[in-house]
Amino acid sequence: MTINVLFLAAEAEPFIKVGGLGDVAGALPQAIYRSSKTASSKNSVDIRLVLPYHFAIKQKGLKPKLLGDFYVKSVDGPEPCQVYYYDQGDIPVYLLDGDPIDEKSPVYSSDPIYDGYKFVFFSLAALGLADFLNWRVDILQGNDWHTATAIYALKTLDITSPHLSQTKALHTLHNLPYMGFGVQKALTDYGLPAVKTSILPEWARHAPLPLALLTADRIVAVSPHYAKEILTPEFGCSLENFLKTRQSVISGILNGLDTEEWNPETDPLIERNFSVSSLTLRRENKVKLQRDFDLLENDEIPLLTLISRMDPQKGIDIALKGLEYIEDLPWQAIILGTGNPIIEKMAQDLEKVYPNRVRSVIEFNNKLAHQLYAGADIFMMPSRYEPCGLSQMITMRYGCVPIARATGGLVDTIQHVSHQVNGGTGYLFTRPYPSVFALTLKRAIKHFQDKKKWKGIQHNGMSIDFSWEKSAQKYIKVYKDLVK
């Protein structure tokens, strides 16, 4: 039996990437297709990726094939949608275009009304794609608020298409706070019915994401722990009571890591390649960092790093303030990232306070990020919330030991170091306070002095399989359950 999956996303590598969704949508469909073709799989999956034909994609010069067009209904009359096809090998890719997808706009603009029209149009056009292709859709998979309207429309509009008559809706939840507010007028103008149920709070009835969470047959959060957290007041964004009514259809599947791009054995962006069996070579990467940043060249001093978007969610202030609590201990730190000007200034100010041990690099620098993963000893990830997280997987794969807040996917991926000789892959702290972070970091620095224990922690982290295949197999199981 072949399961047909229409996978909708606002972005996907290698076509367009703005954030983490681009990584997921670029890698997951490919992994699902590959996993479904293995001898152990009883179901083949025909998964097709659908993206808006953003201006940024057009600039890449890919030259997709124009297949034709069809019309999307709106209260002002039908709107044309052009369908382009790009042959990506195993996964067919469809790029949908139309007037609401303005050629001059970015993928995500600062105007929620404009983005609302663009993504509501795209979501409804994606439903029309089934008839255009004469292709039965077994699973419609949405991602975040941008494609949530497709889920809601499938379940609430009077859709007569035989290709959608048995379709099940699965919505993947990447980041609950981003619900798509400001989209109400677009929903009305495209004929989406108002929500009348009292289960969903009044304030949430006009945003696409809550509407998808209300109507989807299955909801998959991007980590098992995050699937539990969204049911609590701290992480539920005032939807926790509503989400508890949907608890039976909520589960969590951890995102994967592109293990070809992030491979210390072959990474062309680092000074010295290494593996678990040649871990001593890793030191050359640390030496390069210390020399490049004019830090004391001493392998006995732990080199800390933090690579992140400068955003309050990431808890960077927790780490920066926490370092001041342990100024009497030996450490060096390199901070890399850009974003919120207040947090950027905090990083720069810390360098002024500790000019011999702190370096702040306020920019996006992919090459430096690779080198930091490969050369630093300890990775700081004090996120206030982290639905899945990617950096902790990379850092462990590169032999850099993470210290992270015990939240979301960080709980699912980091095994807290115990008092045993070789237990764990990193360190977790519970409360998001600088003092608590500092105590955990102090413990890690103490363990760093014990070379046998530290090497064991590195080995544990580097030995974990974070590939997308594990995630893909779990999604295929969800597909099977839905089409039974």
Labelled PLM ranges:
Residues 1-484:
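Catalytic cores of nucleotide-sugar-dependent glycosyltransferases that transfer UDP/GDP/TDP-activated
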